[in-house]
Amino acid sequence: MYATDFEYDGQYLSDYGFIICHFDYSSGANVATAGSKITFEKVSRNKGKQHSLTNTRYDECVTATFDICKNPELYETEEMMIENDEYRDLMRWLNRREFLKFQALDEDDKLRDTCYFNVSFNVEKVKIAEKLYGLRLNLESDKPFGY
């Protein structure tokens, strides 16, 4: 999925002048869990030649990791560093002790219904030359699917 913005608890990332971006941590591909791992419980029959399904359960919820930074279309190069007050506002908004409504958005999605998730974030700083230029968001949901 390609996304540039998201809504979380009724507010948009773009309201803060930020976009979803990617910092080049390595040249390898990124692998993300779909959060839908199912455990199948089976009973062996016919001396192990056949198994019958007795139960299934989801073992993990949806998780994702992505970066955010200031929108370069709104800020000059020398203004791309995240200031303390901007960092504080983003942390208050994103780093909560509860799951809140979330949806990822691209430019076309703002006017149509999409899939929602109940999520919260753990946040890490992305520093370049000891200056804060971005945040890495580790999204965790309360379900293995959206609604």
Where are these regions (language model features)?
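Extracellular/virion structural assembly segments
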Residues: 1-147
